């Protein structure tokens, strides 16, 4: 990062404008944020800017979805930080930013990102945690008036997520003769299955109109 970029980042983090417009400020500082995350430089400042800006944006219900030019690169970088950074607080903040960012994304992109996160075997911690992000998106969709254009309330939801979330990984997990109880307990799969069953319970409880066709699509 250049000296001027660092100065811009520090000013944005510690002296934010009280009348900041998130749809103007984010695109202008995006290259600096991306560089900061990629190099692990001034990461606390970058996450603070993103949390504050996205939270402010979330409070303005009339704003449209964020541009993919913003959401796609950040959603590509943040999962690794949220999964493997050495500082637990940084991991938590990165995950919070990812949640806010997905909530501000176009629905189709949010859907695609969640499919990728829940099926990414290279980031097992995120594969578990992202089930909660799917639940968050589903509950948000179910809280809105029925809309045929909401991708989370169509049969595509279980066509896409059913084989990822509602089956063990690997598929022969419980029939394998080589699996021991200790191996199973030490893996990420028990926690992932608990999260998936929690999501399915929410789906059964809240989707009273069978909008995602949950009884016939599995």
Segments (PLM) and residue ranges:
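Alpha-solenoid helical repeat scaffolds
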Residues: 1-112, 128, 132-136, 141, ...
């Amino acid at each position: 990062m250049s000296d001027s970029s660092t100065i811009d980042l520090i000013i944005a983090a510690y002296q934010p404008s009280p009348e900041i417009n998130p749809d103007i400020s984010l695109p202008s500082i995006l290259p600096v944020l991306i560089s900061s995350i990629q190099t692990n430089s001034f990461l606390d400042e970058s996450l603070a800017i993103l949390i504050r800006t996205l939270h402010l944006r979330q409070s303005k219900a009339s704003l449209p979805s964020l541009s993919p030019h913003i959401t796609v690169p950040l959603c590509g970088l943040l999962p690794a930080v949220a999964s493997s950074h050495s500082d637990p607080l940084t991991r938590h903040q990165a995950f919070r930013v990812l949640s806010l960012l997905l909530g501000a994304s176009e629905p189709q992109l949010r859907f695609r990102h969640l499919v990728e996160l829940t099926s990414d075997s290279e980031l097992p911690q995120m594969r578990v945690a992202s089930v909660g992000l799917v639940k968050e998106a589903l509950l948000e969709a179910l809280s809105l008036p029925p809309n045929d254009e909401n991708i989370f309330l169509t049969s595509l939801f279980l066509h896409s997520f059913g084989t990822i979330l509602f089956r063990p990984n690997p598929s022969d997990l419980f029939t394998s003769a080589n699996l021991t109880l200790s191996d199973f307990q030490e893996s990420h799969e028990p926690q992932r299955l608990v999260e998936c069953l929690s999501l399915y319970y929410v789906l059964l409880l809240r989707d009273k109109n069978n909008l995602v066709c949950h009884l016939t699509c599995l």
